[in-house]
């Protein structure tokens, strides 16, 4: 079994893991990102909205598909409430695959290491370091690190392993991308109401080239 040593190990190579690796590797630390999937940015994880401040921080404007000025909120009684100002940028719609890959690539270029097809299997916290076992492409590795960061999302291995609590409420969501929807340019739409999305809302988000992302979240 191979043994590796790093200053920081980050579980999850999404935007948060990628950004953390960029900042830490930029300080001269030896950083490893561990990603369970074979491809960064897949499977698709969210609706792909990124605020201007977050985009400015990572500077990957080439991943932007649409600019959005605001939201048209449809109430259950038929009311329509616009939130935002025409011509004033409120958020970006990005290609999540390209966005994730670009942010993670920044970490790699800063000196971080990236392991895909890799999952942590065991961990032990010792006084001087964290001892981690990782299965990578079927091969087991021992890793010593001074710091372990969990950036592994809603089903976090890190949270479960360290018994950091459980979500108070579970929700279920579905999203698809469609062609032919006639929406208002530079505005997304939100629909609330128990008949449409009990406990949360549905959305329509322009995603470029005449397409829209239509999805719903509701209580499980």
What do these predicted ranges mean?
Residues 19:
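Short alpha-helical segment within the catalytic ATP-binding CA
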Residues 43-46, 162-163:
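Short, solvent-exposed loop/turn segments at secondary-structure boundaries
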């Amino acid at each position: 079994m191979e043994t590796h040593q790093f200053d920081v190990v980050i579980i999850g190579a999404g935007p948060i893991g990628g950004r953390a690796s960029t900042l830490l590797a930029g300080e001269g630390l030896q950083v490893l990102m561990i990603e369970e999937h074979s491809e960064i940015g897949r499977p698709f994880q969210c609706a792909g909205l990124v605020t201007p401040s977050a985009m400015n921080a990572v500077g990957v404007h080439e991943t932007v598909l649409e600019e959005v000025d605001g939201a048209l909120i449809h109430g259950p009684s038929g009311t329509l409430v616009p939130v935002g100002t025409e011509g004033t940028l409120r958020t970006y719609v990005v290609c999540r695959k390209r966005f994730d890959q670009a942010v993670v690539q920044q970490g790699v270029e800063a000196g971080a290491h990236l392991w895909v097809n890799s999952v942590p299997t065991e961990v032990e916290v010792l006084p001087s370091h964290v001892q981690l076992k990782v299965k990578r492409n079927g091969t087991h590795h021992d890793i010593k690190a001074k710091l372990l960061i969990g950036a592994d999302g809603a089903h976090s291995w890190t949270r479960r392993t360290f018994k950091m609590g459980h979500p108070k409420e579970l929700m279920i969501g579905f999203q698809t991308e469609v062609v032919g929807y006639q929406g208002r340019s530079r505005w997304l739409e939100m629909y609330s109401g128990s008949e449409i999305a009990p406990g949360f809302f549905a959305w329509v988000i322009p995603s470029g080239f005449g397409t829209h992302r239509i999805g719903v979240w509701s209580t499980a």
